[in-house]
């Protein structure tokens, strides 16, 4: 019996669930739990617990996480993310902003927040 924690580097355009299904097909008797879902458009580490280690999945899920993002200024999309159609764009120059302006804006995105999906 295999017990352990896998760290899978999930590529863009593939769902977390597809990896779980693939593991289940490889070993049907394997008990599998994952520690959070990544959006299909996201890349990153998908943490998967196997057999006896599944009891630690909730502990690992509640651990602190870090995210890295790429921000595109001056573009508005139909979905509010990089996957949508660009519905508005404006010329943008960092010369229009001081480093303090950028720092103050970044601070607004730190900590817990609730996201409002586009209407």
Where do the PLM segments sit?
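Catalytic/RNA-binding core of pseudouridine synthases
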Residues: 1-119
């Amino acid at each position: 019996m295999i017990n352990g924690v896998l760290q899978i580097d999930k590529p863009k355009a593939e769902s977390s669930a597809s990896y779980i299904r693939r593991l289940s097909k490889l070993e049907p008797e394997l008990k599998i739990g994952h520690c959070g879902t990544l959006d299909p458009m996201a890349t990153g580490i998908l943490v998967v617990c196997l057999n006896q280690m599944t009891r630690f999945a909730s502990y690992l899920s509640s651990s602190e996480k870090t995210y890295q993002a790429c921000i595109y200024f001056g573009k508005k999309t139909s979905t509010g993310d990089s996957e949508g159609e660009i519905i508005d764009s404006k010329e943008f120059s960092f010369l229009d902003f001081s480093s303090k302006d950028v720092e103050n804006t970044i601070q607004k995105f730190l900590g817990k927040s609730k996201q409002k999906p586009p209407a």
